[in-house]
């Protein structure tokens, strides 16, 4: 791998806006902490693997073959969070291929179920060290001077100041309540022991705004540790979340589940009262402990037997709009694992 260091923090969103085809995917730490102080802009996308229907060949098996053929060397410069590889989007509907016995219905959305894009180069901002690192795999070293030149001619971020007008629709309350009743029947019958029931929201813009405009407004309204702007040819993904699902570093995997939330208070006293309520509420504690058990079981499938430990238990993380209860579980991966089954 080849790299080049620049002092200072490059505006990755501005570079993405200037050249979205060359730099299509941004992962950003907007609310920074010791857990997350990097932002990454992926560069020069190569081949793409997509899954559009569950009846197509296994996405995970195909991706595993691509991953092994690429042979990305991740031993050099281990301190960096990305050293070449893939940008991957996995929709919930992929469970239909991982667990075909569930016979899940197809999604009505005109989106791919999963996408993997080969990425040989990236720009990484370390918000703690206040540096920017340009990296490229050895076979793609010619991209380094191009990225450097782009950074030296970086235009200012241009945003639409027009008011955002949105027609928002959501599933009816009756549909949600019917789902609750059906779940209770499943639990009573012993068919399930955990369900995540959600409601669909759909909005239609009444004014012209780019994906960059929407992302900028989201990160201002909800600054979070893990934000994403990914622009594909036919659709974009915009997200902002406090939760990291999985991290793998030096053969150790960890997950950091969140369960338990309270809004921030109107003043310091009210904020502290809400925080104490979150800490002591029996329902919140029971739900969080259940989630820890589920995550331990999930990690146990890929970790060495009996090695999964909770090294942080029911801590409070506070963000601009809310308090969260957070734990951290980790363990060493089994030998010989690859992304595939």
Enumerate the language-model features and the residues they cover.
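Extended alpha-helical targeting/anchoring segments
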Residues: 1-341
């Amino acid at each position: 791998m080849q790299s080049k260091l620049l002092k200072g923090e490059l505006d990755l969103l501005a570079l993405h806006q200037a050249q979205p085809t060359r730099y299509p995917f941004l992962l950003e730490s907007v609310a920074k902490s010791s857990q997350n102080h990097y932002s990454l802009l992926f560069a020069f996308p190569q081949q793409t693997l997509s899954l559009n229907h569950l009846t197509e060949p296994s996405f995970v098996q195909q991706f595993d073959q691509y991953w092994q053929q690429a042979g990305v060397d991740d031993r050099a410069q281990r301190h960096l969070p990305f050293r070449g590889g893939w940008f991957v989007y996995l929709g919930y509907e992929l469970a239909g291929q991982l667990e075909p016995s569930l016979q899940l219905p197809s999604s009505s959305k005109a989106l791919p179920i999963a996408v993997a894009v080969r990425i040989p180069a990236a720009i990484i901002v370390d918000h703690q060290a206040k540096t920017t690192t340009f990296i490229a795999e050895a076979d793609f070293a010619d991209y380094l001077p191009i990225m450097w030149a782009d950074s030296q001619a970086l235009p200012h971020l241009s945003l639409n100041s027009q008011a955002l007008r949105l027609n928002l629709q959501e599933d009816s309350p009756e549909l949600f309540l019917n789902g609750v009743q059906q779940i209770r029947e499943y639990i009573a019958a012993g068919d399930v022991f955990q369900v995540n029931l959600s409601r669909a929201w759909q909005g239609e813009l009444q004014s012209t705004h780019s994906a960059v405009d929407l992302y900028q407004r989201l990160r201002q309204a909800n600054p979070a540790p893990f934000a994403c702007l990914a622009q594909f040819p036919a659709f974009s993904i915009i997200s902002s979340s406090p939760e990291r699902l999985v991290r793998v570093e030096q053969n150790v995997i960890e997950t950091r589940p969140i369960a338990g939330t309270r809004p921030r208070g109107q003043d310091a006293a009210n904020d502290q009262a809400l925080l104490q309520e979150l800490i002591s509420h029996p329902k919140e504690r029971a739900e969080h402990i259940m989630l820890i058990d589920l995550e331990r079981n999930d990690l146990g499938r890929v970790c060495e037997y009996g090695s999964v430990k909770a090294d942080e238990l029911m801590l409070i993380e506070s963000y601009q709009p809310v308090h969260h209860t957070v734990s951290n579980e980790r363990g060493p991966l089994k030998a010989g694992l690859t992304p595939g089954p």
